[in-house]
Regions:
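Polytopic transmembrane helical bundles with strong interfacial aromatic enrichment
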Residues: 1-165
Length: 165
């Protein structure tokens, strides 16, 4: 079940930008490399922040310091991912836009971004937000778990796009 129909994909695939992407041998592998490097930077930063929230790594550092270290990487890598992903879609519109797994990836991406924004916002409002009481600590553990699951789901769904319809 795709939200975008084949006629749109045919039109998009026939645009001059799509034609250049499709016919220049090095563009798609370069875009894929950029996309993979950006997701590696974003994913590792998000996971390390989440693991700190769990208390698994860097327990001796305040959470605000961990956030200061990793959130800039996340917010730098995200637009790189979105731009490289958009060009990959333009280059191969049917591969993504007619694939249900692509829409699963987009839903997981939206969830992951919202959770990450919520985690960052809570710390900017109060640096000790997740450490104030047991209820907040449990909520932080839950948010970190959702974050890890959502970002992992983005990775997995992104990889599966090549192998599903």
């Amino acid at each position: 079940m795709a939200f975008v129909g084949a006629p749109f994909c045919i039109w998009l695939g026939s645009t001059s930008v799509s034609q250049v992407i499709q016919t220049t041998k090095w563009i798609i592998p370069t875009l894929q490399t950029i996309h993979i490097l950006a997701i590696a930077a974003l994913f590792s930063s998000a996971i390390l922040f989440d693991l700190r929230l769990w208390g698994v790594v860097e327990r001796d550092l305040p959470l605000k310091d961990i956030a200061r270290r990793f959130f800039p990487v996340i917010w730098f890598a995200l637009p790189v991912l979105l731009i490289s992903g958009a060009f990959l879609i333009v280059g191969e519109p049917k591969r993504a836009l007619l694939n249900t797994t692509f829409y699963l990836k987009m839903a997981l991406l939206a969830c992951a971004i919202l959770v990450t924004l919520g985690l960052q916002w809570s710390l900017s409002a109060a640096p000790d937000f997740w450490d104030r009481d047991r209820r907040r600590k449990n909520a932080g553990l839950f948010a970190a778990t959702v974050s890890i699951m959502a970002w992992s789901g983005v990775l997995i769904a992104g990889r599966w796009i090549a192998y599903t319809d």
